[in-house]
Amino acid sequence: MPRLSTKTDVLIIGAGLAGASLALSLPASMKATLLSSGAAPCSASTMALGGLAAVLSAQDSVELHIEDTLQAGAHHSDADAVRNILQAAPQAVQWLLERQVPLDRTPDGQLHLTREGGHSQRRIVHAADASGYAIMQALYPQLQQATQLLQRTNCLALALRRNEHGRVAGVDIYDKQTHRHETILADHVVLATGGLGSLYAHSTNPDTAKGEGVALAWRIGAAIRDLEFVQFHPTCLYTQGPTFLLTEALRGEGGHLLDAHGRRFMPDYDSRAELAPRDIVSRAIAAQMKREDRAHVGLDVRHLGADTLQRHFPRALEEGLRRGLDLRQDWIPVAPAAHYSCGGIQTDLSGRTSVPGLSAIGEVACTGLHGANRLASNSLLECVVMGRAAAQAIEGSRAAHCSALTPEDERSKTAPTFAGSPHTPAPARDNNNNNNNNNNNNNNNNNN
């Protein structure tokens, strides 16, 4: 049976917040296909709890947000990427509001801002303690209504294709419903496949987060950066059942981490105590667990009050009760789990990789924002900012790209084309190479 071939302007592989932001930001004149591997669109974005970090108060400033990001990332971040993405944060929040995302507000109608570890100010906009779910619930119907967008589920991306100019021009897929191999040809291919956390035994990620996007790009020689930096979230519920992440904001609002004797131990490790960045808190918890020969520590939020817990943390309260724990009355057993890949496919600030025709956005990409350790709530922000930036770049380059593969090319193609050795890819940006060379040796211990 001959292989099926279809053609689209933009092929987006991954249906999380990054892919959705791109799809909804493309002009109506461009035909796009949104590919996901599950039976329904599912991603780590729906599991994100905290929110988006953005400077929205008079007490805050972009410079403070930049400094917090650089400190959390052990100064391994790319300074230009940090400044550009964080400066775009208020516009990203406004875009979500225009998309009818129900962000929490104060009684006087202002956006409610919470604080999380590593942040010096309150700057996290959120939807209770299930921000990612609320965002995607608002965006998915809009994706379905976009007439220029074709959504395909149950499809696995197998290999990227390139034309005679070396430009990525399509992808080979396997449709799990029809059991057929197909080729989707595209003028622009965008990887938005998420991270690799489910490679670890204990992870907050969905089962699909196995690093397939990085593998696809690596196989054709795309530059990869900082894969060694995998963030562990400090506070995952330690009970029987699937890993459940307890939002950073529980500590941001004043929650305490306790040892076996009910004593706060974080002040022994860092002056910021529970508000230290995630890598510091995770290492401190691991050290405390080893010292006490225990599999977890305690998280105490009882003093926040039942009203605060019910209003701002309903999901955590509900899940605790479902597992026989009451956050209003009990210490909660918590332990770290693999959470976020800070590295990935190296890109510029429009999502372009080192391989023409291929872009990457979201957790699969490495813009240089996160450095050796991501600052809380900078990831959903990056998804929106980079999704919109990639859409703008694709629209701007529409008339200039090389010709894509055509269905007729299929009959003469025998194997994927590789661009040199994938072990020595060309860098996407020279300044990042300098960053890598200067910082690799100094930062290997920043995210154990």
PLM ranges: what are they?
Residues 38-70, 74, 231, 241-247:
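Conserved N-terminal glycine-rich FAD pyrophosphate-binding loop of Rossmann-like flavoproteins
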Residues 1-8, 25, 31, 39-40, ...:
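Glycine- and aromatic-enriched mobile tails/lids
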Residues 153, 158-169, 174, 312-365:
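A glycine-rich dinucleotide-binding beta-alpha-beta segment and adjacent secondary-structure elements
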